[in-house]
């Protein structure tokens, strides 16, 4: 696809026009069936509760599709954090890859969500952690119990227990390994002991992953966000990229339109290399977080021109590894402090402009739920995953309780109920920025040319 040229002058003019009390109507939003979309990241647990148990669920998310889509904010892609059965609140330790966590609903609820998204022109991508499973996954339980049953000195065999081949076991203690209680065996668990690392060199594991991809793609999922790509083979970037190349090829063999975006939490020169795998997108950490390009420009610690020159430079860098790359700019996510805390004494102006800078970058732009309200949340992870701030009313239908270990704190800006009718609110500014992006397809699909 030939990209159009988008100048920094046009970008700045769009930011300024977003300050006016005007916005494109739904009828002017342009829908193009490609992956240069405008995505909204949802942590289902904290988003919207449909049954009053205090935990967000798929039915709750479905009830808010008009808020997310063209009738509301204008997003046309949703990325959900993992929705699979898991013993944790965050659900990155998967116990079953082909089902829905009961806290979130059922497979029938998921099918309904996909259908309702499709009706609205919204595609859905799932967060898929393939680096590790839960220690409660039947694969690991079987392998662990097998090793416990071995006589002292006996050699294990995948012929006796095929799941022994699914994980990385060792008789010797190593960094990043955990002891199997009552044995001299250890298993790789780079994150925590409850997340044993999969053996991604195993053909059996690869066959399982292929079946998982097919299961969800046939249910209407448009793609996947791949967690922790640098950890596929810890310390071996070449092998990690080789595995990602295999995974990308398999996904597109099942569904040529499958979209994949990888989390490669590293410096820009390193994560750019992962485009060699052929993957569609890699998250653009260079512009994200409190020390990223967006926050530095808005805080005035670097010249405003850096925004355009850095985009121009990185577009050339990424294209040198994959000419068909689609950038994945984001500003914050579930692992980062929320952006409202980046700016001292901010009346909302900096929060607004920073959000627009993210939304006016090329590729598929990602916005974390609640950023459109200027929600707060920093420190421990649970605080960064606070309940969506629909209302100040504790009896509001759909309001979630949030993670049990999160601190209780006041928000910096009002709830959605109090912002939606204020034309100068953070919410309405975000809404305008999303709609400008959708109304001008060249923003997502163009090359940046920094002009003096």
Predicted regions and their residues:
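Acidic/aromatic-lined carbohydrate-recognition and catalytic surfaces
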Residues: 19-210, 218, 225, 229-277
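Loop/helix patches that line or flank the sugar-binding groove of alpha-linked glycan CAZymes
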Residues: 266, 330-333, 344-452
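Glycan-recognition surfaces
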Residues: 249-341, 360, 382, 387-408
């Amino acid at each position: 696809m030939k990209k159009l040229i988008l100048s920094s002058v046009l970008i700045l003019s769009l930011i300024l026009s977003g300050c006016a009390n005007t916005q494109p109507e739904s009828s002017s939003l342009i829908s193009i069936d490609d992956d240069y979309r405008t995505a909204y990241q949802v942590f289902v647990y904290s988003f919207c509760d449909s049954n009053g148990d205090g935990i967000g669920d798929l039915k709750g998310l479905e009830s808010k599709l008009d808020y997310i889509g063209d009738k509301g904010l204008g997003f046309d892609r949703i990325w959900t954090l993992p929705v699979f059965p898991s013993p944790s609140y965050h659900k990155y330790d998967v116990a079953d890859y082909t089902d829905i966590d009961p806290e979130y609903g059922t497979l029938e609820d998921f099918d309904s969500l996909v259908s309702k998204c499709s009706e609205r022109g919204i595609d859905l991508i799932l967060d898929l952690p393939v680096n590790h499973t839960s220690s409660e996954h039947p694969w690991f339980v079987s392998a662990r119990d097998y090793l416990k049953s071995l006589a002292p000195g006996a050699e294990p065999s995948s012929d006796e227990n095929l799941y022994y081949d699914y994980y990385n076991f060792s008789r010797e203690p190593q960094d990043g390994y955990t002891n199997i209680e009552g044995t001299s065996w250890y298993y790789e668990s780079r994150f925590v002991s409850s997340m044993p690392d999969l053996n991604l060199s195993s053909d059996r594991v690869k066959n399982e992953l292929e079946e998982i991809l097919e299961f969800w793609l046939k249910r209407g999922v448009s793609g996947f966000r791949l967690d922790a790509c640098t950890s596929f083979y810890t310390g071996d970037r070449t092998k990690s990229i080789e595995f990602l190349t295999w995974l990308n090829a398999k996904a597109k063999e099942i569904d040529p339109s499958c979209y994949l975006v990888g989390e490669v939490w590293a410096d820009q020169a390193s994560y750019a290399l992962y485009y060699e795998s052929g993957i569609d997108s890699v998250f653009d950490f260079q512009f994200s977080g409190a020390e990223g390009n967006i926050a530095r420009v808005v805080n005035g610690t670097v010249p405003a021109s850096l925004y355009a020159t850095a985009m121009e430079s990185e577009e050339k860098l990424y294209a040198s590894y994959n000419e068909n790359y689609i950038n994945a700019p984001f500003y914050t996510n579930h692992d980062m402090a929320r952006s409202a805390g980046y700016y001292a004494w901010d009346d909302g102006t900096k929060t607004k402009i920073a959000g627009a800078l993210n939304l006016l970058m090329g590729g598929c732009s990602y916005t974390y739920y609640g950023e459109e309200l200027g929600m707060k949340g920093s420190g421990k992870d649970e605080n960064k995953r606070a309940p969506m701030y629909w209302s100040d009313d504790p009896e509001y239908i759909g309001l979630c309780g949030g993670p049990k270990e999160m601190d209780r704190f006041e928000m910096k800006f009002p709830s959605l109920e109090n912002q939606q009718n204020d034309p100068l609110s953070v919410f309405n500014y975000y809404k305008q920025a999303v709609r400008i992006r959708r109304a001008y397809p060249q923003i997502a699909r163009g090359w940046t040319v920094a002009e003096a």
